[in-house]
């Protein structure tokens, strides 16, 4: 059993190395040579505001931004009625006429990668694609190698590149000057978390590690004030599903692996077909919805899991976009916007 656990751990680490190597060598964002600002005082005038707090749109409003922070949002009139100048904030260094436009907080994408050498070797394409869709903050899981990610995070914060704000979540064992070797035991896990925290990461991207290793990583991350998110892949979900990880203090589940397994009626792992191959993503994605036969909607286990995850303040980040595309491949493949926006290498 000891050697079997070591084999599974090595297999898991080898898979991560392959995935990471695909992101090694990607080009960082070019120095910013376009755009305006920042300004000491920016005023956006006459917009219809969606504030993100659950209320309906309202406007017209004038929004004042000072020192890169919103300092006031002022209602300046009513739809179809001329705006009185005495209701408006003082002039800014720069002003945007937003009449007829909507203003809302930027989206936060909780699961991103910066691309790969094979598919999107230049991060400029990825950054601008996110921004064009209104994504102004991203959590890289990981964005790329540790040093690359921290450099891009700092350059974005300094407005040196055209990119969203970046939060850096990294895999255990990363770091060019990390001398502790592979993270295979609790003691090494804690040492690496302390090392990575000093480097400046924001959190850990975890896998379905064996319980003692997972516990050490999460516990030390909490002590270092780091966040945690996990892809609980099926290669390890029998020993670490969502409720197991949540009880250890995990903050977020990314993807959907491990969630259904936490509320199976009569199984511990999914009943795979005889020709199942985990490395075939069509097999993996195609089997997801088949778990409905193993779960009882609104049943006792369903309700108990829901209540416990809520009590633990646990976050679910299911990343269903690619799965949804896989369920209707022809619609996704023939979308009108591919010709203009999709990088040709994405089709290779």
Residue ranges and their predicted role:
Residues 171-224, 251-252, 274-296:
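Active-site gating/metal-coordination segments in enzymes
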Residues 46, 101, 108-115, 231, ...:
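Histidine-centered divalent metal-coordination motifs
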Residues 126-147, 163-173, 197-209, 218, ...:
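Divalent metal-dependent hydrolysis catalytic cores, especially in the metallo-beta-lactamase
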Residues 145-151, 208-220, 263-273:
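Active-site-adjacent beta->alpha loops and helix N-cap segments on the catalytic face
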Residues 8-16:
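Bacterial N-terminal signal peptides
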Residues 25-40, 49, 53-104:
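Histidine-rich, glycine-flanked metal-binding segment
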Residues 195-202, 251, 259-348:
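Active-site neighborhoods of metal-dependent hydrolases
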Residues 88-160, 179, 184, 240-245:
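Metal-associated gating/positioning segment near the N- to mid-region
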């Amino acid at each position: 059993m000891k050697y079997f656990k070591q084999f599974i751990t090595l297999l898991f680490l080898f898979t991560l190395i392959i995935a990471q190597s695909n992101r090694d060598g990607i080009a960082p964002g070019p120095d910013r040579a376009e755009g305006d600002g920042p300004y000491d005082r920016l005023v956006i005038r006459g917009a219809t505001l969606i504030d993100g707090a659950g209320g309906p749109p309202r406007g017209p409003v004038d929004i004042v931004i000072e020192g890169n922070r919103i300092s006031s949002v002022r209602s300046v009139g009513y739809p179809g009625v001329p705006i009185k100048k005495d209701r408006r904030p003082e002039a800014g260094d720069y002003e945007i006429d937003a009449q007829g436009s909507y203003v809302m907080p930027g989206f936060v994408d909780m699961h991103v990668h910066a691309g790969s050498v094979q598919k999107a070797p230049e991060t400029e394409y990825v950054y601008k694609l996110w921004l064009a869709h209104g994504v102004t903050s991203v959590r890289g899981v990981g964005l790329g190698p540790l040093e690359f990610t921290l450099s891009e995070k700092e350059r974005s914060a300094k407005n040196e590149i055209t990119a969203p704000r970046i939060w850096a979540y990294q895999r255990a064992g990363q770091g060019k000057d990390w001398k502790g070797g592979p993270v295979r035991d609790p003691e090494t896990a804690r040492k690496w978390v302390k090392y990575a925290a000093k480097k400046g990461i924001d959190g850990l991207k975890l896998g379905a590690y064996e319980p003692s290793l997972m516990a050490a990583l999460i516990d030390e991350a909490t002590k270092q004030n780091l966040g945690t998110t996990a892809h609980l892949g099926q290669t390890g979900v029998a020993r670490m599903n969502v409720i197991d990880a949540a009880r250890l203090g995990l903050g977020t589940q990314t993807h959907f692996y491990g969630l259904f397994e936490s509320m199976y009626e009569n199984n511990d792992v999914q009943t795979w077909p005889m020709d199942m191959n985990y490395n075939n993503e069509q097999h993996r994605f195609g089997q997801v919805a088949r778990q409905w036969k193993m779960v009882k909607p609104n049943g006792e286990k369903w309700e108990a899991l829901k209540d416990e995850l809520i009590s633990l303040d646990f976050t679910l980040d299911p990343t269903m976009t690619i799965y949804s595309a896989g369920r209707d491949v022809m619609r996704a493949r023939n979308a009108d916007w591919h010709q203009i926006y999709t990088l040709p290498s994405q089709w290779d």
